[in-house]
Each structure stands twice: as C-alpha cells, then as structure tokens.
Swiss-Prot record:
Gene3D superfamilies: Aldolase class I. It comes from the Bacteria. It catalyses: 1-(2-carboxyphenylamino)-1-deoxy-D-ribulose 5-phosphate + H(+) = (1S,2R)-1-C-(indol-3-yl)glycerol 3-phosphate + CO2 + H2O. GO terms for molecular function: indole-3-glycerol-phosphate synthase activity; phosphoribosylanthranilate isomerase activity. It comes from Mesorhizobium japonicum (strain LMG 29417 / CECT 9101 / MAFF 303099). This is Indole-3-glycerol phosphate synthase. Disulfide bonds: none annotated. PANTHER family: INDOLE-3-GLYCEROL-PHOSPHATE SYNTHASE, TRYPTOPHAN BIOSYNTHESIS PROTEIN. It is an enzyme of class 4 (lyase). One of its GO terms (biological process) is L-tryptophan biosynthetic process. Belongs to the TrpC family. Keywords: Amino-acid biosynthesis, Aromatic amino acid biosynthesis, Decarboxylase, Lyase, Tryptophan biosynthesis. Pathway: Amino-acid biosynthesis; L-tryptophan biosynthesis; L-tryptophan from chorismate: step 4/5.
C-alpha cells in the first residue's frame, strides 16, 4: 500500500468509528433496507454498450489531493442533469471529505435529480460503509484493491450484492488484476493513475486489458480527456470509461460530455 493510501486508511478508520458511534450498525442496516431500490449500475453500462455506444461513468468531484479545487461553481444536481443530458450512463460521486471535499448529500442530491444509477466513490475499509452507501442511495460501490486485502474485498463485495448493489473493482497493476478476477463482480476498473507519482497513462489500461476475460466489463479510469482517447481504448475492447476532472472543468458540461462520447457537440437524432 502506498503512503498516501495509508494516510487515507488512518483517517477513514477514525471516520468509521465515529459514524458507528453516531449511527449504530443495526440502524444503518435499517436505513439501507428502507432506501429506494437500486437502479442497476452494471445493467445501465451494458445497455449502452449493447446499443453500440460508449458507456460513461461521469464523475462529480469538487477537488482532489493532486489538483486541489477542480470546480468552484459546484452544484451536484445540476452537474448530474448536465451529464445525463450529455449521454452519460451512470454517475460517480465523491463522498470523501478530507481529500476530495466530498459529502454524502452530494451523492443523495445528484442521484435524486436524474434517472441514472450512482456509485459511491470513496475509500471503503468496512462493510458498514456499504450499508451507509445504500442508505444514501448509492447503486454501486468502489473496491480499491490497492487498499484492501482479499478477505476485506470479498466482504465488501458480498455486502454490496446482499443489498442488490454492484461493485466496481479497481486495479492498478497485474497483481491487483489477478486478485480482482478471483472476486465475483463482472465490473473491473483499471485506474490509469499511478498512486505513487499521480501521473496517468492509458498504457496501463491497454496492458492490463489483455489479462481480463471477455465476460467481465472493463472500465478505464483517469487520464481520459478526448474522443480520440476513447477510440484508442476501443482498440483494446474497452468501451466504458470513468471520467471526472476533464469534464468538471468545462463551462458547458453537457456539450463536453457529448464531444467526449461522440466527437460531436450536438446530440444525434435517433
């Protein structure tokens, strides 16, 4: 685990302990059970791909540790609607406060403004956080293999499945990819960002894609800025992307989303 992830784990475990003291496990489980039914995150991505289009997980992210503030004019419901209008299949919403200035209400409000499924983008170290995610309305969770061992990854995934959620399993290298493939989830995300240098390279997705069987849905994450980047990854049978920063910085988020997905600013007439 990188030094960055160790620091994140330390404050996350403090957060989890405080959350459990404030809302006991039995209570968060009850809230998760009472939440609206999951919308089908994987199903939404697969539907886009079956229609011959790229599938986009559009990220709502106010800030990041490496780039600082990304968008000052930050309105999660409006951003969610802009992404939906631009053709996104799903949302990813940051809920981590210390590193990303995220919040649970960003997820809840963004999802309520659209019909798209939403992923809780956060660092998960306890199944409690999965119940938390469902209680907030999340349809999917992220499991970062660089930050968890196999037993914890399996426990997080099992909790998500128990709640009818999907799990995006994130990998950065060959060893993590091999571990991810032992899990049941068909959603494998390849993060093109090196967690030690913070540099991004699409070569990471191109390299690791060769290890992943065809029955899994590959998602390329980070470092995707243009339609040409999407076309480049398509050559490796990757047609699903998670994009945040490059869209969040645009004045017209809907047009930027359309250009990324289709190369054109105007919506195609169907």
């Amino acid at each position: 685990m990188s030094d960055i992830l160790r620091k994140i784990e330390a404050y996350k475990r403090d957060e989890i302990a405080a959350a459990k003291a404030h809302v006991p496990l039995a209570e968060i489980k009850a809230r998760a059970k009472d939440a609206d039914a999951p919308r089908g995150f994987l199903a939404a991505l697969e539907a886009k791909r079956r229609s011959g289009r790229f599938a986009l997980i559009a990220e709502i992210k106010k800030a990041s540790p490496s780039k600082g503030l990304i968008r000052a004019d930050f309105d999660p419901p409006a951003l969610a609607q802009a992404y939906e209008k631009g053709g996104a299949a799903c949302l990813s919403v940051l809920t981590d406060a210390p590193s990303f200035q995220g919040a649970p209400e960003f997820l809840t409000k963004a999802r309520a403004a659209v019909a798209l499924p939403a992923l809780r983008k956060d660092f998960l170290f306890d199944p409690y956080q999965v119940y938390e995610a469902r209680a907030w309305g999340a349809d999917a969770i992220l499991i970062i293999m660089a930050s968890v061992d196999d037993a914890l990854a399996s426990a997080l995934e099992a909790t998500a499945f128990e709640l009818g959620m999907d799990a995006l399993i994130e990998v950065h290298d060959e060893a993590e990819t091999q571990r991810a493939l032992k899990l049941s989830s068909r959603l494998i995300g390849i993060n093109n960002r090196n967690l030690r240098t913070f540099e991004t390279s699409l070569e990471t997705s191109e390299r690791l894609a060769t290890m992943v069987p065809a029955d899994r849905l590959l998602v390329s994450e980070s470092g995707i800025f243009t339609h040409d980047d999407c076309l480049r990854l398509q050559k490796k049978d990757i047609g699903t992307f998670l994009v945040g920063e490059s869209l969040m910085r645009q004045e017209d988020v809907t047009a930027a989303t359309r250009i990324l997905l289709t190369g054109k600013a105007l919506a195609e007439v169907v």
